[in-house]
Design a protein with these regions (language model features):
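Long hydrophobic segments that form regular secondary structure
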Residues: 191-204, 209-215
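Alpha-helical scaffold segments that flank or form the walls of functional sites
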Residues: 2-72, 96-109
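Divalent metal-coordination and catalytic microenvironments
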Residues: 45, 67, 117, 148, ...
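C-terminal cap of metal-dependent C-N hydrolases
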Residues: 296-349
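Metal-coordinating catalytic core of metallo-dependent amide/deamination hydrolases
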Residues: 58-188
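His/Asp/Glu-enriched, well-ordered alpha-helical/loop segment
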Residues: 175-182, 223-311
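Active-site gating loops and adjacent loop-to-helix segments of metal-dependent hydrolytic enzymes
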Residues: 1-30, 71, 78-93, 152-182, ...
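Glycine-enriched alpha-helix->loop->beta-strand junction motifs that scaffold or abut catalytic
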Residues: 71-73, 137-142, 178-181, 198-207, ...
Length: 349
């Protein structure tokens, strides 16, 4: 469903996402797509992913099984929805708790695998489901909790209708124990001052998804403003809702969004966001994100002259950042020379 034409977030979910997610109830299909997903992300130089699986436990089993075969580090969880989704894509407060708990107990901490408690977003969960998942997180505080926050203005209005007593969108999570240091909140474009204060207070992580935010017309993430407020931020492709598997393309989009917001991201800042910054957001800074001695050897080696246009800029550069920047702006999978995962060189497809 990547790069599927759509009008707005809810339209896109109903037209493309939900019908595709229905198919993951079938183990063979879930296994096929899991393998293809890991092949495509590796080919674009990505070695660690945080993924929303579907509501089906089979989808989580398939992704973790395939990642374990490859020795790959991955964070994933069963998406939980008990309303405002089609028949066949809804669970209940109790089944979301029970199935998430069973998957967590089976997979979390096995090899390089981590489980994330995963309510899709407030509109598709009843208060009862959010409460149940908050209880599960409290019982397993070493897990991440991942969800979406304040992606589009009309989505926020919908949240206000569904949760009339909530102070704001973030409060629909906070009220049920789903705000914390190990919380990871995607998009977070249209935040209220109170929300920013609370995210900073608990040291939660926001995830900037520039390709999907522009692709679906959600808005411009205020990287500079949030950085000035001390809010932790990572960078992600949001593959299903975006237009590319490439973190290089995502870095270029982040640069462009910053420019539209009146700020400039240096090449070093972009690389940090895609590596150490994102590792920090996933609480994996002690394992991945840098080339320091003792870190896990997840490495992407870039060809800084992968196309004629990039090579021309590279050959005329006089400073190392000037040699790197063209690849960040114009690079794609052709710029990925080698990928190593867990110290093993990958055969790229």
């Amino acid at each position: 469903m990547i790069a599927s034409w759509g009008k707005r977030l809810i339209d896109w979910l109903n037209t493309y996402t939900f019908p595709e997610e229905m198919r993951f109830d079938h183990p063979a299909y879930a296994a096929e797509i899991s393998a293809r997903y890991l092949d495509l992300t590796a080919a674009h130089g990505t070695t660690t992913m945080a993924s929303f699986c579907t509501i089906h436990p089979t989808s989580v089993e398939a992704l973790f099984t395939e990642a374990a075969k490859r020795g790959q580090r991955i964070v994933a969880g069963k998406t939980c929805m008990d309303r405002n989704a089609p028949e066949g894509l809804r669970d209940t407060a109790q089944t979301s708790y029970d199935e998430s708990k069973a998957l967590l107990e089976k997979w979390h901490g096995v090899g390089r695998l981590s489980y994330a408690i995963t309510p899709r977003f407030s509109p598709t969960s009843t208060p009862e489901q959010l409460e149940a998942l908050g209880v599960l997180w409290a019982e397993n505080p070493d897990c991440l909790m991942q969800t979406h926050l304040s992606e589009q203005v009309d989505e926020i209005a919908w949240v206000k209708d569904l949760f009339p007593n909530a102070r704001d969108y973030l409060d629909t999570y906070e009220a049920f124990g789903l705000l914390g240091e190990r919380g990871v909140y995607g998009h977070a474009i249209h935040l209220e001052p109170r929300e920013i204060d609370r995210l900073k207070d608990v040291d939660a992580a926001l995830v900037h998804c520039p390709t999907s935010n522009t692709f679906i017309g959600s808005g411009l993430f205020d990287m500079a403003g949030l950085k000035a407020r001390g809010v932790s931020t990572g960078l992600a492709t949001d593959t299903g809702g975006g237009s590319s598997f490439s973190m290089l393309r995502t870095m270029a989009a982040a640069y462009e969004v910053a420019q539209l917001n009146g700020s400039v991201l240096h090449a070093g800042q972009l690389l940090w966001l895609a590596t150490a910054g994102s590792a920090k957001s996933l609480h994996l800074s002690d394992k991945i994100g840098t080339l320091e001695v003792g870190m896990e050897a997840d490495i992407a080696i870039l060809d800084l002259a992968s196309t004629a246009a990039i090579a021309q800029r590279y050959n005329n550069a006089t400073h190392h950042w000037d040699r790197i920047f063209p690849t960040l702006m114009m690079g794609d999978d052709r710029a990925i020379a080698e990928v190593w995962i867990g110290g093993a060189k990958q055969i790229l497809s």
